Amino acid sequence: MKKPIYKVLYVQVIVAIIIGIALGHFYPALATDMKPLGDAFIKLIKMVIGPIIFCTVVTGIAGMEDMKKVGRVGGKALLYFEIVSTFALILGLAATHLLRPGVGFNVDPATLNGKEVASYAAKAHGQTTVDFLMHIIPDTLVSAFSQGEILQILLIALLFGAVLAHVGERGKPVTNFIESLSSILFGMVGIITKLAPIGAFGAMAFTIGKYGIGSLLPMLKLIGTFYLTSIVFVVVVLGFIAKMVGFNILRFVAYIKEEMLIVLGTSSSEAALPQLMLKLEKLGCSRSVVGLVVPTGYSFNLDGTNIYMTMAVLFIAQATNTDLTWGQQLTLLAVTMLTSKGASGVTGAGFITLAATLAVVPTIPLSGMVLILGIDRFMSECRALTNIVGNGVATVVVSAWEKELDRSKLRAALSRDVSVTESAEV
């Protein structure tokens, strides 16, 4: 029997977002007090992200007959990430050249107050590429889970799953236990997801209440350019990839609409990570591929962040009348390919990564970040939405490459609506 419309999750989230915007606009002081509601929802999701990734990866790998497959899946995923990320970076650069959102500002860098972005710059300087790679190795097994470090948890799960596969029947009781634990955790996700409207309301009310809709007006051209470029990337680039694999990108976006609305409300792609993994399994992707590709993608396949990075850097250059040679722009692309890998699905991570990029490209004034500081929160939503679609498509593509995509499930799932709570029950 079809649910009444008021009980449908994505409808509840849409209504909550609209109410949050209205409260933030008309009662900003009260709206900023709603922040704990959004924070609490994200914390609840983060509470189960680590264990879910661990269980999904371990059970997926433990069931593999050929351990070489782990390296093969990982290699294909990283190859896909690099190719598509490069397209995203180039598209961001090309769109900014074409639409020129920063031209006409004529800002003197000497008049900008760099103190406002000093904290972001300090965080950006704090980690080199070697530090990032070393950080993947946890201090202890417990610390990876207690600190919610996705890549560290993924490393532990890979080793744990490989050992379980190696010991064979002796490890079967442990595998069965982890599979049962996984079912319980996804059941928890189904319960937590029902609170998504409250979380989306709180986060959106705080954003509008603190920054105000009026703060968007001077920068509408940049915001519009970013949103338009992201839509073009999803529809054209990801749409072409999806067509090559055998599915429609618009149907896929409709399939994950609940997760996208949660991301829109909370401005964090991590807020929908467990639900996305569940939906991708229901779509016909194998558990082992989902477990490997999705968590890795949250650090290495942030398409929305990549578009934002090149666009923001070039916008600052245009606004401050800083001329960049083609050689410098190619250097910018190379640097951004590295710095963007340090970003995560957390709100504000893109801005810290931008600071890291500008620190390596000294021609552009770091203080220019002040120009977009006030609107970054509004651009964060688009980054997160593009990231979640990109990671979803990547998982389907790698599953297809591995011949572990159930085409009948794919067709059935994209032809009807499957909610997270339904998936959890299954």
UniProtKB/Swiss-Prot annotation:
Keyword annotations = Cell inner membrane, Cell membrane, Membrane, Symport, Transmembrane, Transmembrane helix, Transport
User: Has the keyword Transmembrane helix been applied to this entry?
Assistant: yes
Keyword Transmembrane helix present in the record's keywords: the answer is yes
Example of a GO biological process term: L-aspartate transmembrane transport
Query: What's one Pfam family here?
Result: SDF
* Membrane topology field: Multi-pass membrane protein
Q: Where are the transmembrane segments?
A: 8-28, 44-64, 78-98, 148-168, 184-204, 222-242, 297-317, 355-375
Taken from the UniProt entry, a GO cellular component term is: plasma membrane
Task: Kindly give the InterPro entries that the UniProt entry links to this protein.
Answer: C4_dicarb_transport (IPR023954), Na-dicarboxylate_symporter (IPR001991), Na-dicarboxylate_symporter_CS (IPR018107), Na:dicarbo_symporter_sf (IPR036458)
Q: Where in the cell is it found?
A: Cell inner membrane
Extract one GO molecular function annotation from the record.
Answer: malate:proton symporter activity
Q: What PANTHER family has UniProt attached to this entry?
A: AEROBIC C4-DICARBOXYLATE TRANSPORT PROTEIN (PTHR42865:SF1), PROTON/GLUTAMATE-ASPARTATE SYMPORTER (PTHR42865)
Family classification:
Belongs to the dicarboxylate/amino acid:cation symporter (DAACS) (TC 2.A.23) family.
> What does the protein in this record do?
Responsible for the transport of dicarboxylates such as succinate, fumarate, and malate from the periplasm across the membrane.
Can you say what this protein is called? C4-dicarboxylate transport protein
Which organism is this entry from? Paraburkholderia phymatum (strain DSM 17167 / CIP 108236 / LMG 21445 / STM815) (Burkholderia phymatum)
Gene designation per UniProt: dctA
